[in-house]
């Protein structure tokens, strides 16, 4: 691929979005398998699968925090690097890249220490019971060691995609996903390691992906290269990066807080089976969210570059294509989940009681999935335009102002089935949040275009 990024400002938008989004969506589909394959295998461990799945599910708030910190730096730095490239300032773009690399390493070291020292305490606070705690601790003790691989792979891959090297970014995910899919059954069942084998497979796979990502960004084929002289942490680059990435961090870290709230409420009203079902529900949710993020990542360099280059019509056109594509995907997946919930639930468990419970919960929890496309398209466009404030407002509104209170309010209102009432909080929050986002986006998008 040519190092000339001006194709982002010249090629027809439909062809360009297809060119960039297909690899990123494929990467996210692979990433989806990467994220859920552990749970698929764990849920089918003979005799203890349901409890093991629940125990590992309680680890999700901690895993989401690790991913959130990677996204904080990656989503904060990559759009700023793209905008700098659009303005023709490659030197500044490389300084942003180097700064983000150093930030990822520093954050990963701190997270590793915290997770190794206090994961049991966290898991007990997050909804683990005496039946599931040992499965969670066994998983996290091993997963914590590979935190640096997760940080660098997830966080720095944004910079590969942001330069237009979507296929290279996809390969980084593909390497890890294939490795994980192959290693999981070998370590879980072949070596009888159970959840420890799942965790070990994950960190080995992330390590291989990390090698691929860094070899590219330190190599000669990339437009922006990590250089030693650009690794210094300077206030003028660190703070804007954190500001822009904070919206995604709020979204992902709030998912951790939400998972804790869901687990606590579900454990109270439904016990271990309700918490186990939640693990499956959030896994199925990734079928929607990760491909939608892939579409947004494909559109991000187009929107950011053309915004930096002052090409208003191309910015508007790219957003419209992103919105239509996102809405179509979300609607089709919603239909599939509503018609065949047992198919999705059966991927993660063969336990009859858990399977029957999850089928009902799935239809309730994902009842508003068809509007996810609107929320994600607007959210990712805010970030592509460098609008940190609007992104934060949208994230805070949906998660903190709407969803978390509803998790506790709904079972108090619908006492006939308090467990299912907890799940109902999700679609109600989704609908209200999308209405708010549409109003805010129309105002902020118009304001951003007026500055070009």
Residue ranges and their predicted role:
Residues 50-61, 136, 140, 199, ...:
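Small-residue hotspots at the loop-to-helix junctions and early N-terminal turns
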Residues 22, 38, 77, 118-119, ...:
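Hydrophobic/aromatic residues in alpha-helical transmembrane segments
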Residues 19-38, 142, 176, 205-209, ...:
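Transmembrane helical elements of multi-pass membrane transporters/channels
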Residues 8-48, 61-76, 80, 105-112, ...:
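N-terminal transmembrane alpha-helices
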Residues 1-24, 81-148, 190-245, 303-368, ...:
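Short alpha-helical transmembrane segments in multi-pass integral membrane proteins
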Residues 53-113, 150-169, 277-341, 372-391:
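Small-residue-rich hydrophobic transmembrane alpha-helices
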Residues 29, 33-54, 123-130, 186-193, ...:
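Helix-terminus/linker motif at the lipid-water interface of multi-pass membrane proteins
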Residues 74, 143-161, 172-177, 198-211, ...:
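Short runs within selected transmembrane alpha-helices of multi-pass transporters and secretion channels
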């Amino acid at each position: 691929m040519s190092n000339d990024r001006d194709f982002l400002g010249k090629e027809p938008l439909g062809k360009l979005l297809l060119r960039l989004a297909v690899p990123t969506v494929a990467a996210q589909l692979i990433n989806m398998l990467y994220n859920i394959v552990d749970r698929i295998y764990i849920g089918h461990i003979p005799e203890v699968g349901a409890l093991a799945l629940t125990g590992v599910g309680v680890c999700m708030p901690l895993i989401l925090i690790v991913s959130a910190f990677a996204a904080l730096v990656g989503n904060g730095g990559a759009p700023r690097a793209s905008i700098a490239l659009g303005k023709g300032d490659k030197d500044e773009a490389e300084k942003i890249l180097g700064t983000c690399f150093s930030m990822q390493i520093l954050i990963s070291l701190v997270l590793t220490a915290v997770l190794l020292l206090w994961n049991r305490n966290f898991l007990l606070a997050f909804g683990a019971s005496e039946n599931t705690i040992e499965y969670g601790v066994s998983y996290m003790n091993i997963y914590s060691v590979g935190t640096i691989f997760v940080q660098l792979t997830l966080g720095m891959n944004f910079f590969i995609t942001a330069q237009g090297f979507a296929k290279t970014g996809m390969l980084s995910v593909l390497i890890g996903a294939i490795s994980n899919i192959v290693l999981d059954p070998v370590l879980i069942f072949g070596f009888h390691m159970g959840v420890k084998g799942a965790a070990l497979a994950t960190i080995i796979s992330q390590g291989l992906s990390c090698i691929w990502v860094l070899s590219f960004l330190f190599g000669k084929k990339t437009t922006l290269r990590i250089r030693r002289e650009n690794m210094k942490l300077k206030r003028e680059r660190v703070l804007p990066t954190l500001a822009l990435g904070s919206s995604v961090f709020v979204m992902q870290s709030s998912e951790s807080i939400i998972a804790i709230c869901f687990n606590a409420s579900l454990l109270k009203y439904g016990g271990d089976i309700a918490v186990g079902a939640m693990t499956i529900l959030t896994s199925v949710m990734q079928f929607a969210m990760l491909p939608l993020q892939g579409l947004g990542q494909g559109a991000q360099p187009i929107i950011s570059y053309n915004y930096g280059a002052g090409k208003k019509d191309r910015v508007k056109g790219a957003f419209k294509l992103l919105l239509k594509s996102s809405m179509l995907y979300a609607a089709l997946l919603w239909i599939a989940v509503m018609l065949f919930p047992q198919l999705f639930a059966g991927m993660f468990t063969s336990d009859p009681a858990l399977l029957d419970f999850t089928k009902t919960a799935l239809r309730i929890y994902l009842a508003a999935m068809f509007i996810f496309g609107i929320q994600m398209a607007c959210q990712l466009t805010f970030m592509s335009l460098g609008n940190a404030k609007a992104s934060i407002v949208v994230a805070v509104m949906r998660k903190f102002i709407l969803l978390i209170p509803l998790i506790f309010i709904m079972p108090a209102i619908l006492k006939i089935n308090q467990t299912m009432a907890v799940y109902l909080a999700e679609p109600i929050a989704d609908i209200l949040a999308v209405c708010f986002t549409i109003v805010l986006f129309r105002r902020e998008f118009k304001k951003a275009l007026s500055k070009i």
